[in-house]
């Protein structure tokens, strides 16, 4: 099998390189995480292969998630599986967009604080799952119109 070539210069002198990356959390705190990419020893080009890019996204999200005290991907998956929900069903229950839960469970994206709080309410009281399921999803006319006693929107 032929060795991979540098996309910049065509050389075959490629090695994995580690670097420390910085990200700023919502509260302004600077956080660092380890990142791996590919470096060409010939021209100095540095780039991500697909798996390195995914790993970088996961590492970035993990440091932000830990700092914010959000549920982990494993905790979200365990909750969903315990209630025998598919990812699409949980998305409908929460009113999120398509593939949102997939990204949370893969660890490539952090859930918002609001979504995290809602998930925690569902975790501590399974009756909340039943309550939301009974109300339907965001496209349900009964939900869109609100219920009697709802305040102004």
Which ranges hold each PLM region?
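Extended interfacial segments that mediate partner engagement and assembly in macromolecular machines
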Residues: 48-114
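C-terminal charged interaction modules
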Residues: 95-153
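N-terminal flexible/basic segments that precede or flank functional cores
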Residues: 1-70, 124-150
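Functionally constrained cores in energy, signaling, and assembly domains
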Residues: 13, 35, 39, 83, ...
């Amino acid at each position: 099998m032929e060795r991979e070539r540098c996309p910049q210069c065509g050389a075959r002198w490629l090695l994995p390189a580690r670097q420390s990356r910085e990200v700023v959390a919502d509260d302004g705190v600077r956080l660092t995480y380890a990142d791996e990419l590919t470096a060409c020893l010939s021209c100095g080009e540095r780039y991500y292969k697909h798996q390195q890019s995914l790993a970088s996204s996961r590492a970035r999200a993990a440091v932000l998630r830990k700092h914010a005290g959000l549920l982990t991907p494993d905790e979200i998956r365990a909750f969903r599986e315990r209630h025998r929900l598919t990812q699409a069903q949980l998305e409908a229950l929460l009113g999120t967009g398509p593939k949102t839960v997939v990204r949370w469970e893969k660890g490539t994206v952090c859930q918002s604080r609001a979504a995290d709080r809602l998930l925690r309410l569902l975790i501590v009281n399974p009756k909340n799952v039943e309550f939301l399921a009974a109300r339907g999803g965001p496209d349900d006319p009964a939900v869109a119109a609100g219920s009697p006693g709802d305040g102004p929107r």
